[in-house]
Amino acid sequence: MINVLIVDDDAMVAELNRLYVARVPGFRCSGSASTLSQAQEMINDPQQEIDLVLLDVYMQQDSGLDLLPTIRESGRGIDVIMITSAADAATVQTAMHYGVVDYLIKPFQ
């Protein structure tokens, strides 16, 4: 089972992501966070089972990019998929530098 953490400050988008994850065999939503500090606490908690993070870039008070070093430094081998409207080259390059496994640009067609 792949345990997914959803990090998005938009409650509706987070819920849609949760519903989608629930429909995919072998995946389950292990939690969600609406702020980077909540996400950091979950990632740094060894009791939390997290294999994959679905991460937004544009959040009200933060940038999801700021969470990427925390994820890498945790040493837990957590994969990241960015799901965001941020389509500029610098943001994509920064995300790729930190080893995100995919970068999906909203809105989807």
Name what the model sees in each region:
Residues 2, 11-34:
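Two-component/phosphorelay signaling modules centered on CheY-like receiver
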Residues 106-107:
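A Lys-centered signature of the CheY-like receiver
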